[in-house]
Amino acid sequence: MEYIEGNTGKWEYVIGLEIHAQISSKTKLFSGSSTLFAASPNSQVSYVDAAMPGMLPVLNKHCVHQAIKTGLALKAKINKYSVFDRKNYFYADLPQGYQISQFYYPIVQDGMIEIQTSTGNLKTIRINRLHLEQDAGKSIHDQSPYYSMIDLNRAGIGLMEIVTEPDISSPEEAAEFVKKLRNLLRYIGSCDGDMEKGSLRCDANISVRRSGEALGTRCEIKNINSIRNIIKAIEFEAKRQVDLLESGEAIIQETRLFNVDSCETKTMRLKEEALDYRYFPDPDLLPLVIHDELINELKSSLPELPDQKIEKYTKKFGLSKYDAGIIVSDESIAEYFEKAANECNPKMLTNWLITELFGQLNKASIGISECKITPSDFAKLIKLIENNTISGKIAKTVFEIMFATGKAPDKIVEEKGLVQISDNKILNTVIDEVIAENSKSVKCYKSGKDKLFGFFVGQVMKKTKCKANPTLVNKLLKEKLDS
């Protein structure tokens, strides 16, 4: 449990999240309009999206399938009967005057995600519901000083709203939950999880309380658009509430916005209750009935999920849960790893992926799909180290050439003459030269200055241009110096 340090003692975070995940679909939830990102304004708007009189919504079957798959991945209950409701409110970018959502009977209920806390323990975050709804359009306020513009390209795009219970106890847990959920959605292909493009948006409901007290008054922070900002927004809002309570003021239930420049939350509007939206079943849409056959079919189509991969990597490949978690955090990296791990030492491969490859990818600002090194060639590099053909230090040089050119490691080693020297006769000759050239250091070593041993190893490596087998050098050198 993480606490907020107030002037009068410690306070607990109580956090629930609402995630709006844009469904990966070529067309909108109730019309055939395209969902292509960054198209010219109002170029992807049908009569249904614009709410022209007499136009009726037609439910997109693919979006329903994506919601069911997501529910199954969340270990949730798929409701065989669900209903679309009208959520009534006025806003300029909502042409219908209401949003089609699911309030009373959502498509998915009672799911869960396990996250790892800062102490290394697993914690279950319960998911209250997942429901389908349509997105609103976009208001643009910076094109003119006199009026706002409306772009309805986004209006009607299908969303999955995923609502947690208030089980989250720190900003870091909230960030970890969103990262894990985003990764899960990407694995099953129901949402691309791109927060920069708005494909995944997060609202945080935050309250604070003393340990053992009832839940406090909550405030909702809308549309947080990055993992980092989730942490910053929750930290600021919780501290703001603690300061108010400790000064004797009450918390007003309201909706607030997070300012990314000042890292503060500001009042947007008073928080509405469900009654304010006057929910009622949409008369233009029949109830959604889902049969067991469809659920079973979609369940069998699910790929291996991140938690399943972690379990496999720890059992089959002997990885730590931490390392396995890093590998599965990106589906393309997990796929790359599996292709290479079947051909070499998986633990050594993991170390090289995390310390060397990830560093180069970050430096080049590219993803693993753009990497010139094939999984097979990466496995060859690991095997060259394993069988003592090259040293670890030389391997780093070979790796850098591979990353830049895409050349196979064995060809680089051959062309550059980088094969490791493991011949005792050759190494003994070099060691004899080093000892002869450093007689004073030898006397100091023999008089008890053991730390000089590293100096002699370095001299041997220098003479062999780092091609000497370091294990063999240590063995032969020790024999010579201790004799």
From Swiss-Prot:
GO terms for cellular component: glutamyl-tRNA(Gln) amidotransferase complex. Its EC number is 6.3.5.-. The keyword tRNA processing does not apply. SMART domains: GatB_Yqey. The keyword Amino-acid biosynthesis does not apply. Keywords: ATP-binding, Ligase, Nucleotide-binding, Protein biosynthesis. GO terms for biological process: glutaminyl-tRNAGln biosynthesis via transamidation; translation. GO terms for molecular function: asparaginyl-tRNA synthase (glutamine-hydrolyzing) activity; ATP binding; glutaminyl-tRNA synthase (glutamine-hydrolyzing) activity. It catalyses: L-glutamyl-tRNA(Gln) + L-glutamine + ATP + H2O = L-glutaminyl-tRNA(Gln) + L-glutamate + ADP + phosphate + H(+); L-aspartyl-tRNA(Asn) + L-glutamine + ATP + H2O = L-asparaginyl-tRNA(Asn) + L-glutamate + ADP + phosphate + 2 H(+). Disulfide bonds: none annotated. SUPFAM superfamilies: GatB/YqeY motif (SSF89095), Glutamine synthetase/guanido kinase (SSF55931). Allows the formation of correctly charged Asn-tRNA(Asn) or Gln-tRNA(Gln) through the transamidation of misacylated Asp-tRNA(Asn) or Glu-tRNA(Gln) in organisms which lack either or both of asparaginyl-tRNA or glutaminyl-tRNA synthetases. The reaction takes place in the presence of glutamine and ATP through an activated phospho-Asp-tRNA(Asn) or phospho-Glu-tRNA(Gln). NCBIfam families: gatB, PRK05477.1-2, PRK05477.1-4, PRK05477.1-5. PANTHER family: GLUTAMYL-TRNA GLN AMIDOTRANSFERASE SUBUNIT B MITOCHONDRIAL AND PROKARYOTIC PET112-RELATED, GLUTAMYL-TRNA(GLN) AMIDOTRANSFERASE SUBUNIT B, MITOCHONDRIAL. Heterotrimer of A, B and C subunits. This is Aspartyl/glutamyl-tRNA(Asn/Gln) amidotransferase subunit B.
